[in-house]
């Protein structure tokens, strides 16, 4: 940076300017005399007070300004403090200001400043940022200059908002007095300055010049003009002091430094000119005022302190007089010194050589074409908003994911909002804070303005609230505190957000908060400590007078509603509303119209929950203080420090927030999973208009300035290029390199080229990497915990995560929640039996604590497993390690189909860290292969993303290999009899349980064989053979599949380290192990799809506009929607791709209370992009919340819980369905033991408060459910007889409907098509769903019997038929005659063992049960007498196949009774043309266990998580009438057993179906022979 800019004020106390040094920061006396170093010095005789006032003055505001003013600057560390010789005795900065820190005036940030010690917290890793951070967060600055310890926490006792001396009006009066004297003595100087400032502000204000194309510079430009205006106002008000001029200059220098460090644009020259002009304008008055305020006595104090400090700091050992002379500005040639010191401080950034290189660098980056739309591939829509939409995109070169906000230009022009778009761009570009979303670049297209930001995967807090209701206090406290830090940062730079709400608080994949959406923000004046007098706080609260009412109605502050002036306190009001919403579940003020809502905001009191639901006292106090109608009294008006001091945060470590483990960690199914977001397509329809040609020729000229590229993006880019230069240097071995990517574009050379990169190395060449200096440097830099800002490209970050975690696959213990993937070493001399395959805890069925990442499961493997002999000589541990490392790196490189040049490996020094700035994911890898890695890689096994925003995606929660994108299959052409590879089956245990599934790995590939030529690699996990998933198949089945395929077999593999399987010590209890088997699926994928479609829960969740799946938070209510495992598969326990089969969620929001709008466009349908890879709903995501569940589900507002009106803006047309209440689930890894929960969890449905936001559906059904909560609880209790619900305490859908028959209010007026399930079977036609008024029931539980064929009336309790043709609205069916029995079956889910009748308590059900058995038995055994019941022909039982049109195999032995007898499934004849009403008997599925024999099993106690090994019963085929009658299982009811209706009574777990019903009075044999 040009030195000549630095010190307009440098010689203020000198009678004349030394020639040529006007703008030079001489080590001048300019500060020497004015700083009250006394208070800041380390001298033991001079106590350091806690206020910015000089200690020796007693901090009395009544002291004369001559004594007072000069001392205050002691608390500002000026940018020039870098000149190490301590310009201005820079001890001033010793205990003090955070100007070197990230905020412009972090004097606000007290000893627990948010930015101050963030240098401990790596948050967006590129090494290029280390220098920046060290300066920005105060590390090198403090170390290299003489005020070395000045930012140490111990010496930062005070914060600006507590400065007593600044607030008292007496101090202001003295300032005014001094100004009066000054104006009297120097009238012309003052007048000239004011006139020049006025002209300057008018000429250069942002509205009168074209906006700068660079966002950082544009922001700085705005701040410079604001500072000029502030100076003008203060001068007119007589409030100017020397101190003020110091701080003004300090801020200008800081801004200029930011401009140089953070922008590569040529527009820096314009900003530099502005700063020069402003410094020249204020230089004369500043000098004069300084002379006027000079205090000789104070000056001697300063000299004394400086001398002491210089001696103590060993900065000046010999020549103290020369030091003092230099400080007095008496040296005429300061230049060499300045250059030398700047070199020392900033690493030489100002030396000419450095300038050359930086110029060269910036010119090369300028030569690069600016980013444009063509650089990004759009993956999918994330969410819609009022002005545009946000898309998930991937950069084509770096393969890094971003969120791209596309704003329709036409909309902006019509609404005159162009300036606002620039403001948003500038703020996002300038902001560098771990709690604020960062922007990478912006550009315009023909129709849109696009902003490319970091992608934060975890969705927003609004979706979280919508799905789980109120947050536990600890969770709310953490989210709130992180938002406070974001707000503190923004306010220090003069940014008022104006639209704070949970929707704009995004959750990173590490569970931390990032603030986003600055579309309504205002840029005001950055904080100045000299502005902290009472009048200014008032002025600050009325900073903007535009009288706009903007924001979201529920969060708008009273002063905005009343159209008074407003300022930063509006954000604190919104924070109060947010905290209330976090803790209570709904906002405090409601109204059906904005007017009504605003009326409440201005006049109403807050309603607080009472009794059990009451909030903690300190939380209530904090909310009340934030929701003060008067902005001057509101907490936070004096700065964020006031809020941070509140007792609610008593035990909070503000500096370590990013290190805290979050309770909610999003779990992504793939790198492209956006299911945590609500697309809001129902509210905003402009997406489709994007393709229309709606551009206008006369678009404003400033729009062309929108394109910009932030330093983050340039750094990511340059690091990519740097890396690409490193990769080709890696040595290659032709013998060991085998092609990994058969589909690589181009000829074999290209594939070979890829192999020549990091990935292609074989063992011999890999060993050098482990000890390479790059690696060591890399680890060291990571351990330093300093981090860069820009997020690294995926390839780089991931690749090094691979390179540096060799120990991961041998370490059985990991403390953090990255239960990561392990790669088996191919060659290894380690003891072969100590390998352990782990599955992340979320997938584990076994006991789990609430911490996500404890070692959970071990896999026992036979000696030698995973350890094929090495062909490369000595198979030492390090080599195995390097093999792993490079294999992993190679996979990362190739699996993204990237060429070496594009995704090179990272060079040393970069921190592997997710850019979400979450320090949690820093890795400190050990190169020792046997060490344990304390923090495993933040990379998800399944994600190839480089996303800065947070641990790219979470560890796979899948039993199956969990690959983010399967590579295309490797096709092996057999030559002769051999394919040329060996495969082996391995056991993979689920968590700590004894249940394992079978996986298959490529054990050995013959050199030169067909497999090697095709690119197959030893050690890879086989996922599919000929397109058929092989997970769960036993070895012979896989071999059979391969052999069936003739001369050509297509094998899909994935590198082992890319799976979620971990290797650990051998299993001791392997003799207890049970295999969770999965049948080979005989049918094609379309069969699977139709099977899935036929599942009840899929039908329910397909009601698009009523129930959108919001996978995000199904964590609290898991059910067994058998999304992936077929009911017919005896290995239901382990679906191929379902991550936690036993934790699959309910039809997501069906049990989530406030039927949530979809948080993902792809979340609810099986063939959506997000769910096609794994058809399951997200597993638990709220770790450790079980103890807090009772708080989570308390009613929203006690007395007034029923009056929660909806947001005035809500206009969703679709009424809500009577969705079941959210039922608390359990954290993942819930133990197998029975867990007891408070009875109220079982009986009364918890209330989820609706978020009164425009996203919510109309209110009546939900509200009425809220009102009738107690009634519902009673009815549930009575109906269910208190039975615990199995599987996460959930009611089956039919049960749920049944429970609520009496509640008219619970049923919506509209029914979506998805609710009518397909009717399968011959002659069946799909019934059309109708919309009718009045109370309705799902056909699954009420009138419309989906199982009755066309034309058949469904019998009703009264014996009357519904004239409408079989769909009745109200009356539940009652089976009172043998001809009208109807058994319902939950097609998609193994849940209830008992026969489900729609009658209430047991009497009718028992009658039904008895009446049901005889006809069936007689029919089955052929012994039915013709003299049976007169007029009642045999009742055929039709067991519906799960997939229409697909032949279903009779499964393998299904289960046995306690005696081990195998029982086939009943095969029941079908009467094609039954003369009468055909009745459908539907066999209820039950949980199966894979254990085929053993002691008599007791009925399973209700668990929160179902048994992992419980397979399902396949529905049998319809067989001809002549077929041999089937034998029902021996575990059917014995004579006289009477099932209780409505209760979840279960047959023994090995039972197959509750088909053994007894006709009234008829005995029922336990088992029937053929």
Curated annotation (Swiss-Prot):
The family this protein is said to belong to: Belongs to the protein kinase superfamily. AGC Ser/Thr protein kinase family.
PDZ domain span: 969-1057
Expression sites by tissue: Both isoform 1 and isoform 2 appear to be restricted to the brain. Isoform 2 is strongly expressed in the neurons of the subventricular zone and granule cells of the olfactory bulb, Islands of Calleja, hippocampal dentate gyrus and cerebellum.
Polar residues compositional bias, start-end: 29-45, 66-80, 94-104, 1139-1148, 1228-1237
Modification Phosphoserine occurs at: 90, 139, 167, 346, 689, 895, 954, 1414
Alphabetized SMART domains for the sequence: PDZ, S_TKc
Binding site residues for ATP: 382-390, 405
Annotated protein name in UniProt: Microtubule-associated serine/threonine-protein kinase 1
Assembly and interaction partners: Interacts with the microtubules. Part of a low affinity complex that associates with, but is distinct from, the postsynaptic density. Interacts with SNTB2.
Spans annotated as Disordered: 23-80, 94-117, 139-171, 341-377, 717-911, 931-967, 1061-1186, 1202-1294, 1307-1570
Biased composition (Basic and acidic residues): 738-779, 1083-1092, 1278-1294
GO CC, one annotated term: cytoskeleton
UniProt-listed Enzyme Commission number(s): 2.7.11.1
UniProt keywords, alphabetically: ATP-binding, Cell membrane, Cell projection, Cytoplasm, Cytoskeleton, Kinase, Magnesium, Membrane, Metal-binding, Nucleotide-binding, Nucleus, Phosphoprotein, Serine/threonine-protein kinase, Transferase
One of the GO BP terms on file: protein phosphorylation
Residue ranges occupied by any Protein kinase domain in the UniProt entry: 376-649
Domain AGC-kinase C-terminal: 650-721
Regions of compositional bias (Low complexity) in chain numbering: 105-114, 151-170, 933-961, 1104-1132, 1149-1174
GO molecular function, one term: microtubule binding
Record-listed Phosphothreonine modification sites: 351
């Amino acid at each position: 940076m040009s030195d000549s800019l630095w010190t307009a004020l440098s010689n203020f106390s000198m009678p004349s300017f030394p020639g040529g040094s006007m703008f030079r920061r001489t080590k001048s006396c300019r500060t020497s005399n004015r700083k009250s170093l006394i208070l800041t010095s380390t001298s033991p005789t001079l106590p350091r007070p806690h206020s910015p006032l000089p200690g020796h003055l007693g901090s009395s505001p009544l002291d004369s300004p001559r004594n007072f003013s000069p001392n205050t600057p002691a608390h500002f560390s000026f940018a020039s403090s870098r000149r190490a010789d301590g310009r201005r005795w820079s001890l001033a900065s010793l205990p003090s200001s955070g100007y070197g820190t990230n905020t412009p005036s972090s004097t606000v940030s007290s000893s627990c400043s948010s930015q101050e010690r963030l240098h401990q917290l790596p948050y967006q890793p590129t090494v290029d940022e280390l220098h920046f951070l060290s300066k920005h967060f105060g590390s090198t600055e403090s170390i290299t200059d003489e005020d070395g310890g000045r930012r140490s926490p111990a010496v930062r006792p005070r914060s600006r908002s507590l400065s007593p001396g600044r607030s008292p009006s007496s101090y202001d009066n003295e300032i005014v007095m001094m100004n009066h004297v000054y104006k009297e003595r120097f009238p012309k100087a003052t007048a000239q300055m004011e006139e020049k400032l006025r002209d300057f502000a008018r000429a250069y204000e942002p509205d009168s010049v074209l906006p700068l194309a660079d966002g950082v510079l544009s922001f700085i430009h705005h701040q410079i003009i604001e500072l000029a205006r502030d100076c003008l106002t203060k001068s007119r008000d007589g409030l100017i002091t020397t101190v003020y001029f110091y701080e003004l200059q300090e801020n200008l220098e800081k801004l200029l430094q930011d401009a140089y460090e953070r922008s590569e644009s040529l527009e820096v020259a314009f900003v530099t000119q502005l700063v020069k002009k402003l410094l020249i304008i204020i230089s004369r008055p500043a000098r004069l005022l300084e002379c006027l305020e000079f205090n000789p006595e104070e000056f001697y104090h300063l000299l004394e302190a400086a001398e002491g400090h210089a001696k103590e700091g060993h900065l000046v050992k010999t020549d103290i007089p020369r030091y003092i002379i230099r400080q007095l500005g008496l040296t005429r040639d300061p230049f060499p010194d300045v250059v030398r010191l700047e070199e020392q401080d900033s690493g030489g950034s100002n030396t000419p050589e450095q300038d050359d290189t930086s110029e060269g660098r910036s010119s090369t980056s300028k030569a690069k074409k600016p980013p444009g739309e063509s650089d990004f591939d759009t993956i999918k829509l994330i969410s819609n908003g009022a002005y545009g939409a946000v898309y998930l995109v991937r950069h084509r070169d770096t393969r890094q994911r971003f969120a791209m906000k596309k704003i329709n230009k036409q909309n902006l022009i019509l609404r005159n909002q162009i300036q606002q778009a620039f403001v948003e761009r500038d703020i996002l570009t300038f902001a560098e804070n771990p709690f604020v979303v960062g922007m990478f670049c912006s550009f315009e297209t023909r129709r849109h303005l696009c902003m490319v930001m970091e992608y934060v995967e975890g969705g927003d807090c609004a979706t979280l609230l919508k799905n789980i209701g109120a947050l536990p206090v600890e969770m709310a406290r953490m989210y709130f505190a992180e938002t406070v830090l974001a707000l503190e940062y923004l306010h220090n730079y003069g940014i008022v957000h104006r639209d704070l709400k949970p929707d704009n608080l995004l959750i990173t994949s590490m569970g931390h908060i990032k603030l986003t959406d600055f579309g309504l923000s205002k840029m005001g004046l950055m904080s100045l400590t000299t502005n902290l007098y009472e009048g200014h706080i008032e002025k600050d609260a009325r900073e903007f007078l535009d009288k706009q009412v903007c924001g979201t109605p529920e969060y708008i502050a009273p002063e905005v509603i009343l159209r008074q002036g407003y300022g930063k306190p509006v954000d604190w009001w919104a924070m109060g509303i947010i905290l209330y919403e976090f803790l209570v579940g709904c906002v405090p003020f409601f109204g059906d119209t904005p007017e009504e809502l605003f009326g409440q905001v201005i006049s109403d009191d807050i309603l607080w929950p009472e009794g059990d639901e009451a909030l903690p006292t300190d939380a209530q106090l904090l909310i009340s203080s934030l929701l003060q109608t008067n902005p001057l009294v509101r907490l936070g008006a004096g700065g964020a420090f006031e809020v941070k001091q509140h007792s609610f945060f008593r035990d909070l470590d503000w500096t370590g927030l990013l290190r805290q483990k979050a309770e909610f960690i999003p779990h992504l199914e793939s790198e492209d999973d956006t299911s945590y977001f609500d697309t809001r397509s129902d509210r905003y329809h402009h997406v489709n208009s994007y393709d229309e040609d709606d551009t206008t020729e006369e678009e404003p000229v400033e729009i062309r300035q929108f394109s910009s590229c932030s330093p983050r993006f340039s750094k990511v880019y340059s690091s990519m290029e740097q890396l690409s230069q490193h990769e080709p240097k890696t040595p290659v071995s032709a013998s060991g390199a085998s092609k990994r990517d058969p589909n690589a574009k181009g000829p074999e050379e290209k594939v070979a080229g890829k192999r020549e990169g990091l990935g292609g190395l074989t063992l011999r060449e890999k060993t050098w990497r482990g000890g390479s200096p790059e690696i060591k440097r890399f680890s060291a830099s990571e351990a330093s915990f300093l981090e860069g800002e820009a997020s690294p490209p995926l390839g780089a970050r991931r690749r090094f995560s691979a390179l540096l975690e060799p120990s991961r696959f041998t370490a059985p213990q990991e403390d953090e929640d990255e239960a990561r993937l392990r790669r088996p070493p191919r060659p290894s001399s380690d003891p072969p039996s100590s390998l352990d395959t782990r599955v992340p805890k979320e997938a584990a069925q076994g006991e789990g604590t609430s911490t996500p990442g404890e070692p959970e499961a071990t896999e026992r493997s036979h000696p030698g497993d995973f350890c094929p002999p090495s062909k490369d000589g000595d198979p030492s541990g390090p080599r195995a390690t390097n093999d792993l490392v490079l294999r992993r790196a190679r996979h990362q490189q190739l699996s993204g189909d990237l060429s070496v040049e594009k995704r090179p490996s990272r060079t040393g020094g970069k921190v592997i860290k997710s850019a979400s700035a979450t320090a949690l994911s820093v890795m400190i890898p050990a190169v020792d292969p046997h060490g344990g890695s304390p923090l495993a890689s933040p990379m998800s096994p399944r994600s190839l993303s480089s996303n800065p925003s947070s641990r790219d995606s979470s560890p796979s929660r899948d039993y199956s290999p969990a690959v983010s994108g399967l590579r295309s299959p490797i096709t092996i052409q057999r030559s002769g009899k051999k394919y040329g590879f060996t495969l082996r089956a391995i056991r993979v245990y689920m968590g700590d349980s004894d249940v394992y599934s079978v996986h298959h790995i490529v054990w050995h590939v013959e050199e030169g064989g067909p497999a090697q030529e095709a690119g197959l690699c030893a050690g890879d996990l086989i996922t599919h053979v000929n397109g058929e998933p092989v997970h769960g198949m036993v070895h012979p089945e896989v071999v059979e599949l391969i052999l069936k395929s003739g001369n050509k077999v297509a094998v899909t593999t994935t590198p082992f380290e890319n799976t979620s399987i971990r290797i650990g010590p051998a299993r001791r209890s392997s003799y207890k192990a049970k295999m969770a088997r999965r049948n080979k699926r005989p049918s094609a994928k379309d069969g699977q799809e139709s099977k899935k479609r036929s599942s009840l829960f899929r039908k329910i969740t397909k009601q698009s506009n009523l129930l959108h799946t919001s996978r995000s938070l199904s964590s609290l209510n898991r059910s067994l929607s058998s999304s992936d495992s077929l009911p017919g598969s005896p290995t239901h326990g382990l679906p191929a791709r379902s991550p936690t089969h036993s934790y699959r969620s309910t039809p997501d929001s069906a049990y989530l209370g406030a039927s949530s709008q979809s948080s993902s466009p792809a979340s609810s349908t099986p063939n959506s992009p997000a769910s096609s890879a794994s058809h399951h709903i997200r597993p638990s995501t709220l770790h450790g919340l079980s103890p807090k569940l009772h708080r989570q589900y308390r009613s929203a507002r006690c007395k007034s819980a029923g009056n929660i009106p909806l947001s005035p803006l809500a206009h969703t047309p679709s009424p809500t369905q009577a969705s079941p209440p959210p039922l608390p689930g359990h954290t993942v890894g819930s133990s197998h033991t029975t867990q007891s929960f408070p009875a109220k969890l079982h009986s009364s449905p918890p209330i989820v408060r609706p978020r009164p936001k425009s996203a919510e559906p109309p209110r009546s059904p939900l509200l009425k459910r809220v009102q009738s909560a107690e009634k519902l609880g009673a009815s549930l209790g009575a109906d269910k007889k208190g039975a615990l619900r199995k599987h996460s305490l959930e009611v089956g859908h039919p049960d749920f409907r049944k429970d609520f028959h009496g509640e008219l209010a619970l049923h919506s007026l509209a029914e979506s098509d998805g609710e009518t399930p397909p009717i399968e079977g011959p002659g069946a036609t799909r019934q059309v769903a109708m919309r009718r008024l009045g109370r309705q029931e799902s056909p699954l539980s009420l009138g419309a019997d989906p199982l009755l064929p066309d034309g058949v009336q469904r019998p009703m309790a009264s014996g009357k038929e519904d004239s409408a043709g079989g769909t009745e609205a109200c009356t539940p069916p009652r089976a009172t005659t043998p001809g009208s029995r109807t058994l319902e079956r939950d097609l998609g889910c193994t849940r209830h063992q008992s026969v489900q009748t729609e009658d209430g308590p047991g009497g009718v059900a028992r009658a039904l049960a008895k009446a049901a058995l005889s006809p069936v038995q007689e029919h089955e055994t052929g012994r039915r007498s013709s003299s049976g019941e007169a007029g009642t022909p045999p009742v055929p039982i039709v067991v519906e196949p799960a997939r229409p049109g697909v032949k279903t195999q009779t499964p393998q032995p299904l289960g046995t009774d306690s005696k081990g007898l195998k029982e086939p499934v009943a095969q029941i004849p079908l009467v094609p043309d039954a003369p009468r009403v055909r009745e459908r008997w539907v066999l209820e599925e039950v949980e199966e266990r894979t254990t085929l024999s053993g002691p008599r099993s007791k009925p399973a106690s209700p668990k929160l998580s179902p048994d992992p090994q419980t397979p399902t019963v396949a529905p049998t085929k319809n067989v001809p009438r002549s077929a041999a009658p089937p034998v029902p299982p021996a575990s059917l009811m014995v004579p006289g057993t009477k099932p209780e209706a409505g209760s979840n009574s279960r047959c023994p777990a090995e039972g197959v179906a509750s088909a053994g019903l007894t006709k009234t009075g008829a005995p029922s044999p336990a088992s029937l022979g053929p």
